[in-house]
Amino acid sequence: MDKCPSDQQQTDTNRSIVAHPWRHDPEPTSRPAVTALSEEELALKEHVSAFAKEVIGPKVREMDDKGVMDPEIIAACFEMGIMGIEAPVEYGGVGLGFTAACVVIEEIAKVDPAVAVMVDIHNTLNITAFNRYATTEQKEKYFPRLCKSALSSFCLSESGSGSDAFALKTKAEWDEASQEWVLNGTKSWISNSKEAEIFIIFANTDFSEAHKGITAFIVDKSNPGIAVGAKEDKLGIRASSTCEVTLENCRVSKDAMLGKRGQGYKMAIELLNEGRIGIGAQMVGLALGAFENTLPYLHERKQFGRSVADFQGMQFQYARALMEIEAAKVLVYNAARLKEAKAPFVMEAAMAKLKATEVAQSTASQCIDWLGGIGFTKGMPAEKYYRDSKIGTIYEGTSNIQLVTIAKQIQAGYRV
């Protein structure tokens, strides 16, 4: 019979947990597993899974070879309603939660991580930014487009500001005569930029205030002061466009400011913390896609008169691989649920992205090993998953930045 701790022991246990602010839920709860989906989320998962396989699947190889996102795929994503997951229904959105967005990203990433990151950035960064910081007038103006047809881009990074993202040089100056903001600078490594119609631009309105001068602006593609450069020829997620975005005397009205002046730093930090969960979902989907595309071959392939999947040495490997994928998925959905519950989630988001990225890389690599020589060719999807997985260690905070974030959160719990 299990021994129950005394009241004093229980009190001591609770006290030790509460003492560290990075521990969030010390009390036992009756909630289901964090990966358990609501009826709405489950229906969405099944719907998106079928869409990804039937609509995106046939075009994956061609888009990867050409390094171009098929416009029909972008249009289909809007038609499906998955480009406004968290946008309010009254503006044309779906009105679901953040976890639903993660479900969509994961399911698409199983088929093509490049399409998944397009959907991810549009939803977890840009739709969230408009949800949280846009005025009523801005929501009325932009949400119908963002939900129905206009792809968006999040323009923070610059060539001289990588992990130190807020060392940006793009400036915004107020022109009293015309009553406009004038933006000048160059953004680098901007996802979705080739196809985007709406850009969120981060610029500094006063360099003497350092990061406190950073402000976000909404810029439309039709603005003559914005230009998108050539598409980068990347190792992976090749269909996802990555370009320079140049602002040259780009004039916008005062109504184009997203949020308040000087709020850009806080805005970007918040959005990137949430966006990391979306990247975690992408990496979990990638790992599952590689795994699920490889396992049938292991059962079909015969060596020494037996299915390769029947060899114990192989069983140990794919059993451990799926265990790691499930562990990463739990971290991702735990972070998503915490974010939805408005609980602290910064450390959990960093853990989720880091773990999911590591698992995606290791799973994709193992899948090539399991397939043997054929896995090293473009005849099997494993090599694409392998190439696509690498970006997870780089964008929306490198793996080392995630470790720094986790360490800072832990330290905060022990400071006197």
What name fits each language-model region?
Residues N249-M267:
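Long, acidic (Asp/Glu-rich), low-complexity accessory segments flanking structured domains
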Residues I127-Y133, F154, S208:
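Flexible, glycine-rich active-site loops centered on histidine and acidic residues
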Residues E180-V228:
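A short core secondary-structure module
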Residues K148-S157:
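A short, Trp-centered hydrophobic/proline-enriched beta-strand micro-motif
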Residues G81, I105-A109, A203, V219-P224, ...:
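Short Ser/Thr-interspersed hydrophobic loop/turn segments at strand-loop and sheet-helix junctions
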Residues A167-K169, S222-S253:
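Flexible, small-/acidic-enriched active-site or ligand-binding loops
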